[in-house]
């Protein structure tokens, strides 16, 4: 059997960002509206700083208004919620995102609950989760929404496909399953405690791995010809001893890529697969939120 098609998330994301920029230009020209995204960063987690910087740069590149609000690691819950309230009320801001993780003394659940559902571009509030589950228009979590863009291009019509999602988080696993269900897939949600997980995975025409365990999904778990979407991301020392000694690292997904590509029909690499789609979908969600908040048809 020939090797799997490698799904180029960077190329898809670049096209999506171009589409978003074109939509933004139309909103500015026809409605005098500039979509605005505010990102809140608490503390100085290095990975979060990189993510936040990338979000800001890509927001500006799409012609949108970008704000980054930085709070110290010892900021109180009240300070953070006060900032979120101000952003909820700011008519120039259409998307509000708090970069997680936050320091341990802060309640992630309370933070999510404070974000206006109309500006919840991460799709985490119970209102958006409920709307998604009910088949109503919703702001959908960016990573699963990006996965669906990839799947629709690679697979085409998803009707009747057997889909297995490994992972049940509110940010990824649950909304991914809802989106697949809405596309008329037959969906199984599995997780690290599922019995005989390899056998469950072998039934899948579409396998989405989002469990957070490096290379847990082996090649012999995959149905020949299946489409594999690897959402996991773990960091390990470089295989090159010199590079490792210098602190260089490599990124690894939840799927044993070298094994899986010999069996799957198509597969996303890590890095360069799902990751680039996440920020592109964040921009798309912000444009959607701006349109809805201003009564503009999508």
Swiss-Prot record:
GO biological process assignments: L-histidine biosynthetic process; methionine biosynthetic process; purine nucleotide biosynthetic process; tetrahydrofolate interconversion
Record's keyword terms, sorted: Amino-acid biosynthesis, Histidine biosynthesis, Hydrolase, Methionine biosynthesis, Multifunctional enzyme, NADP, One-carbon metabolism, Oxidoreductase, Purine biosynthesis
GO cellular component: cytosol
Catalytic activity as recorded in UniProt: (6R)-5,10-methylene-5,6,7,8-tetrahydrofolate + NADP(+) = (6R)-5,10-methenyltetrahydrofolate + NADPH; (6R)-5,10-methenyltetrahydrofolate + H2O = (6R)-10-formyltetrahydrofolate + H(+)
Keyword NADP: yes
Binding site for NADP(+): 167-169, 192, 233
EC number per UniProt: 1.5.1.5, 3.5.4.9
Gene Ontology molecular function, alphabetical: methenyltetrahydrofolate cyclohydrolase activity; methylenetetrahydrofolate dehydrogenase (NADP+) activity
Protein family per UniProt: Belongs to the tetrahydrofolate dehydrogenase/cyclohydrolase family.
Record's protein name: Bifunctional protein FolD
């Amino acid at each position: 059997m020939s090797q799997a098609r490698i799904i180029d998330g960077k190329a898809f994301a670049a096209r999506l960002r171009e589409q978003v920029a074109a939509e933004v230009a139309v909103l500015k020209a026809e409605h005098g509206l500039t979509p605005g995204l505010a990102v809140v960063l608490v503390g100085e987690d290095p990975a979060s700083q990189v993510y936040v910087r990338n979000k800001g740069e890509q927001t500006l590149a799409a012609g949108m208004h970008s704000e980054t609000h930085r709070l110290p690691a010892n900021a109180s819950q009240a300070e953070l919620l006060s900032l979120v309230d101000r952003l909820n009320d700011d008519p120039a801001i259409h998307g509000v995102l708090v970069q997680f993780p936050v320091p341990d003394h802060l309640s992630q659940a309370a933070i999510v609950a404070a974000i206006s559902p109309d500006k919840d571009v991460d799709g985490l509030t119970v209102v958006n989760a409920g709307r998604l589950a009910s088949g109503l228009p919703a702001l959908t979590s960016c990573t699963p929404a990006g996965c669906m863009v990839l799947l629709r291009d690679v697979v085409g019509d998803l009707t009747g496909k057997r889909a297995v999602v490994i992972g049940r988080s509110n940010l990824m696993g649950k909304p991914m399953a809802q989106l697949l269900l809405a596309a008329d897939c037959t969906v199984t949600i599995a997780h690290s405690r599922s019995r005989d997980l390899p056998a469950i995975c072998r039934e899948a025409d579409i396998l989405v791995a989002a469990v957070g365990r490096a290379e847990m999904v082996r090649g012999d778990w995959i149905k020949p010809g299946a489409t594999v979407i690897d959402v996991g991301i773990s960091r390990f020392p470089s295989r090159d001893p010199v590079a490792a000694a210098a602190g260089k690292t490599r990124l690894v997904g939840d799927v044993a890529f070298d094994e899986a590509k010999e069996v799957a029909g198509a597969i996303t690499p890590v890095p360069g697969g799902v990751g680039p789609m996440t920020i592109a979908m964040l921009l798309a969600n912000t444009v959607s939120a701006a349109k809805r908040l201003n009564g503009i048809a999508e």
